[in-house]
Amino acid sequence: MQEKISKFEDFLTQLQQNITTALEQHETNAAKFISDKWQKPDTPDQKLKGYGNSMIIEGGEIFEKGVVAFSRVHGSELPPSATAKRQELAGKSFIATGLSLVIHPRNPFVPTSHANFRIFIAGADTDNPIWWFGGGFDLTPYYPFEEDAIHWHQTAKNICDKHDKTYYPKFKKWCDEYFYLKHRNEYRGVGGLFFDDLNDKSFDECFNFVTDCANSYLDAYIPIVAQRKNIEYSQKHKDFQLYRRGRYVEFNLVFDRGTIFGLQSGGRTESILSSMPPMATWKYNWQPELGSEEEKVYQYIKPRDWIK
């Protein structure tokens, strides 16, 4: 099992380089991804041990902030967030290896994107370790274009259908349901794919699906960035982007499993919260004007079948 974990780690670290390099090619000022390698001290008082590399870009003309973060951590006991639905795992040691990214563009017409790909192994030090993959990618537009959402979902469907034709409808629905702000009765964006506890096939089959899915992120996102990054925008557009970013913050801090897992397990706080946008605003009881561009967003981000 250690060999398989290391193989996935090698894939993720190469993917990290591929993604950061591809995004930098669209940046028009001197902003670059900065590498921040870290290691948790292997001491008895540390709940979580391991290492990682958080790559951050800030202050770009295209990407106001972005993070592409790799980590490999292990602990003696899974935190409550990881065992809430799987009580049989309570008390087991674990290894978690993953890559998580969030890209916050400066231009309000370029959507925010998020992706995550990970493997968990519970009881890795036993004769019968339990493994599963999780991940996916989702898109959060501020001023949406239907063709962008169609392209995003078509890319997701193509990669799913290559492995299992039941995956896309199942993982799309899961994504819609997961990225939902219950307290606002709002969806975060136009969705994409979300899956967890993936071990329905052999390890190699699941591995191949997850790596194909991860490699397709750039195919899904880069054409949208290229198409929208030079659209002119006003302060009104920027203000609405900042307001909607507030919803992103609310979701990450209240509902996101990765954030909760990281904080509960004693993870590296600076890396866990690096996905937060550089700026966000909240307005008391604000409502968009009827018929405005801003009002249309709320109709657009409801779940729908994007591929006719």
Curated annotation (Swiss-Prot):
Reaction(s) catalysed by this chain's protein: coproporphyrinogen III + O2 + 2 H(+) = protoporphyrinogen IX + 2 CO2 + 2 H2O
Q: Classify the main location.
A: cytoplasm
Q: Which residues bind a divalent metal cation?
A: H104, H114, H153, H183
Q: Which residues bind substrate?
A: S100, N116, F117, R118, G266, G267, R268
Q: Which residues form the active site?
A: H114 (proton donor)
InterPro entries annotated for this entry? Coprogen_oxidase_aer, Coprogen_oxidase_aer_sf, Coprogen_oxidase_CS
Note down the stretches annotated as region Important for dimerization: 248-283
Q: In which pathway does it act?
A: Porphyrin-containing compound metabolism; protoporphyrin-IX biosynthesis; protoporphyrinogen-IX from coproporphyrinogen-III (O2 route): step 1/1
Q: Which UniProt keywords apply?
A: Cytoplasm, Heme biosynthesis, Metal-binding, Oxidoreductase, Porphyrin biosynthesis
> Gene Ontology cellular component?
cytoplasm
Site (Important for dimerization): give the residues.
H183
UniProt EC number:
1.3.3.3
- Spell out the Pfam families in the cross-references: Coprogen_oxidas
Where is this protein localized, as stated in its record? Cytoplasm
SUPFAM superfamilies associated with the record: Coproporphyrinogen III oxidase (SSF102886)
MF term (GO), any: metal ion binding
Query: According to its UniProt record, which cofactors does this protein need?
Result: a divalent metal cation
User: Biological process (GO) annotations?
Assistant: protoporphyrinogen IX biosynthetic process
State its role: Involved in the heme biosynthesis. Catalyzes the aerobic oxidative decarboxylation of propionate groups of rings A and B of coproporphyrinogen-III to yield the vinyl groups in protoporphyrinogen-IX.
**Family the UniProt entry places it in:** Belongs to the aerobic coproporphyrinogen-III oxidase family.
Its subunit composition reads: Homodimer.
Q: What is this protein called?
A: Oxygen-dependent coproporphyrinogen-III oxidase
Organism source for this protein? Francisella tularensis subsp. holarctica (strain OSU18)
